[in-house]
Curated annotation (Swiss-Prot):
Keywords: ATP synthesis, Hydrogen ion transport, Ion transport, Transport. It comes from Clostridium tetani (strain Massachusetts / E88). Produces ATP from ADP in the presence of a proton gradient across the membrane. The V-type beta chain is a regulatory subunit. Belongs to the ATPase alpha/beta chains family. GO terms for molecular function: ATP binding; proton-transporting ATP synthase activity, rotational mechanism. This is V-type ATP synthase beta chain 1. It holds the Pfam family ATP-synt_VA_C. The keyword DNA-binding does not apply. The gene is atpB1. One of its GO terms (biological process) is proton motive force-driven plasma membrane ATP synthesis. HAMAP family: ATP_synth_B_arch (MF_00310). Gene3D superfamilies: 3.40.50.12240.
Length: 461
C-alpha cells in the first residue's frame, strides 16, 4: 500500500524536501499533488534517515508547502516501449507530442537501463554509410561505435544531424535500421525544423523522436537522453534492429546537471560542473555497442556545442575520454561556405580501421584515406607558406598541393546537406582529386591500386 505524505518541509528551485518518510529508495518515482489538484512528478535524489530529497520534473513554480502531498510509487522512472513508437514524436519524458494515439506498451522499462557486461560485448566491425564523404571516406562510422560531433554555437550541427538521420544505413545487411533522435533543450525553431525534415523526407517512418524544448524544466533534460537510449536498447536487443541514436545538444544536458548540482549545494568541479560529470556522461555513452548472440546494435552520435569553440572545455574534454573519436565542425570552413564544415584533420574515428577494406567498403579505402589526409595537410601548409612568402616562392609541387587542398574542400568535404553519396562515389571522388597531384607524390598508395583506380587521362607522371 502506497503512503501519502503531507510533510513537505522545503522547496528550493527544482528540489523538494519531504520529512518523516519510510522505506523510500534512491531514484524512486514520486507524485506530488499541489494545492490546485495538479499532479507533478519527481524522483528521489537523496535519502538521509527519514528525509527524502526529491527532484521535480515539472519545476516548483506555484507549489504551496502546506497544501502539497507526496506519494512515493515504489518504482523508478519508466518508459512504455513498443515497435509502434517508430514514426512518432514524444516529449522529453516519453509522452506523445504528435496528437497520435497513446502507445500500448509491450513493456515498461527503467530508463537507467542495465549495464552491458564487458565480456558480453562484441567488437564493432561493420561499416555504416552516412552518405557524407568527410565521415564515410576519412572518419568512418562503425556499427556499435560512439562517435560525437563537436560543434560551436551558430554552426549547422542541426542540419548535419538531420542529414545523418535521413541517410544512414548499414551496407550488405538485411536487418532493419532505426533512428532514435533525442533533442535536449532546443528552441521551437529547431524542433520545428527537425520534425518537418523527418516528415517531408519520410525518415520519420523509421525514427522515434524525443523533443525536450528550451522552455521545458531543466530536470526533464536529464531524463530525455535516457528515455531515448532505453527505447534504442529495446529496439536493438529485443527486436534485432540496427539503431542509430543521435543526441543533440548534450551541452544543454550538462548545464541541467550543473543547475541541479548547484541547487543541492554540492562542491563544484571544473567551471562549476559537478565532480561526477565524467561518470554521468559515461552512463549515457557506454549504452552504445553490440552484444554477443544479439543481432541488433546501438550506434551513438552525441552532438555538443563547445562553449567559445574551446576543445578543452570540460564537456568536450570528458566526452573525448569516453567516446571513440570525434567529428569537429570548423568555423573557418563555415565562413568559406563549405557545407557541412567538417574539419577532417583534427577529427578522428578510432574504430575506422575495423569497418573498411575489402568486403566492407573497398580494398583501396585505407590507402586512399591516408593519402587524402597527407595531401590535404600538405596543401594547407603550402597555402600558409604562400600567405607569408607569396605564391611565387612555392615550388611547382607545392602549387599542386595548394590546388589539391582547395579542390578537396570544395568538392570532397563540401557537398551540401541534401547530397547522399555512396561509398563508391566517395572513393572515386577521392581518386579524381588525387590525380591533381604528381603520381610520384602518391607514396601512401600501393602500386597495384594506383594502376587499377587512378584515372589514367588525368594522372601526372
Amino acid at each position: 500500500m502506497l503512503k501519502e505524505y503531507r510533510t513537505v518541509k522545503e522547496v528550493v528551485g527544482p528540489l523538494m524536501l519531504v520529512d518523516g518518510v519510510e522505506n523510500v529508495k534512491f531514484d524512486e518515482l514520486v507524485e506530488i499533488e499541489i494545492q490546485t489538484g495538479e499532479i507533478r512528478r519527481g524522483r528521489v535524489l537523496e535519502i538521509n534517515e527519514d528525509k527524502a530529497l526529491v527532484q521535480l520534473f515539472e519545476g516548483s513554480a506555484g507549489i504551496n508547502i502546506k497544501g502539497s502531498k507526496a506519494k512515493f510509487l515504489g518504482k523508478p522512472l519508466e518508459i512504455s516501449v513498443s515497435e509502434d513508437m517508430l514514426g512518432r514524436v514524444f516529449d522529453g519524458l516519453g509522452r506523445p507530442k504528435d496528437e497520435g494515439p497513446r502507445i500500448i506498451p509491450e513493456k515498461r522499462l527503467d530508463i537507467n537501463g542495465i549495464p552491458i557486461n564487458p565480456v558480453a560485448r562484441n567488437y564493432p566491425s561493420e561499416f555504416i554509410q552516412t552518405g557524407i564523404s568527410a565521415i564515410d571516406g576519412l572518419n568512418t562510422l562503425v556499427r556499435g561505435q560512439k562517435l560525437p560531433v563537436f560543434s560551436g554555437s551558430g554552426l549547422p550541427h542541426a542540419q548535419l544531424a538531420a542529414q545523418i538521420a535521413r541517410q544512414a544505413k548499414v551496407l550488405n545487411s538485411d536487418s532493419k535500421f532505426a533512428v532514435v533522435f533525442a533533442a535536449v533543450g532546443i528552441t521551437f525553431e529547431e524542433a520545428e525544423f527537425f520534425v518537418d525534415d523527418f516528415t517531408k523526407t519520410g525518415a520519420i517512418d523509421r525514427s522515434v523522436l524525443f523533443m525536450n524544448l528550451a522552455n521545458d524544466p531543466a530536470i526533464e533534460r536529464i531524463a530525455t537522453p535516457r528515455m531515448a537510449l532505453t527505447t534504442a536498447e529495446y529496439l536493438a536487443f529485443e527486436k534485432g534492429m540496427h539503431v542509430l541514436v543521435i543526441l543533440t545538444d548534450l551541452t544543454n544536458y550538462c548545464e541541467a546537471l550543473r543547475e541541479v548540482s548547484a541547487a543541492r549545494k554540492e562542491v563544484p568541479g571544473r567551471r562549476g560542473y559537478p565532480g561526477y560529470l565524467y561518470t554521468d556522461l559515461a552512463t549515457l555513452y557506454e549504452r552504445a555497442g553490440r552484444i554477443k548472440g544479439k543481432e541488433g546494435s546501438i550506434t551513438q552520435i552525441p552532438i555538443l556545442t563547445m562553449p567559445e569553440d574551446d576543445k578543452t572545455h570540460p564537456i568536450p574534454d570528458l566526452t573525448g575520454y569516453i567516446t571513440e573519436g570525434q567529428i569537429i565542425l570548423s568555423r573557418e570552413l563555415y565562413r568559406k561556405g563549405v557545407m557541412p564544415p567538417i574539419d577532417v584533420l583534427p577529427s578522428l574515428s578510432r574504430l575506422k580501421d575495423k569497418g573498411i577494406g575489402e568486403g566492407k567498403t573497398r580494398e583501396d579505402h585505407a590507402d586512399t584515406m591516408n593519402q587524402l589526409f597527407a595531401g590535404y595537410a600538405q596543401g594547407k601548409e603550402a597555402k600558409e607558406l604562400a600567405v607569408i612568402l607569396g605564391e611565387s616562392a612555392l615550388s611547382d609541387v607545392d602549387k599542386q598541393y595548394a590546388k589539391f587542398g582547395d579542390a578537396f574542400e570544395k568538392q570532397y568535404v563540401s557537398q551540401g546537406f541534401t547530397t547522399n553519396r555512396t561509398i563508391e562515389e566517395t572513393l572515386n571522388l577521392g581518386w579524381e582529386l588525387l590525380s591533381i597531384l604528381p603520381r610520384t607524390e602518391l607514396k601512401r598508395i600501393r602500386d597495384a591500386y594506383l594502376e587499377k583506380y587512378l584515372p589514367k587521362e588525368k594522372s601526372k607522371e
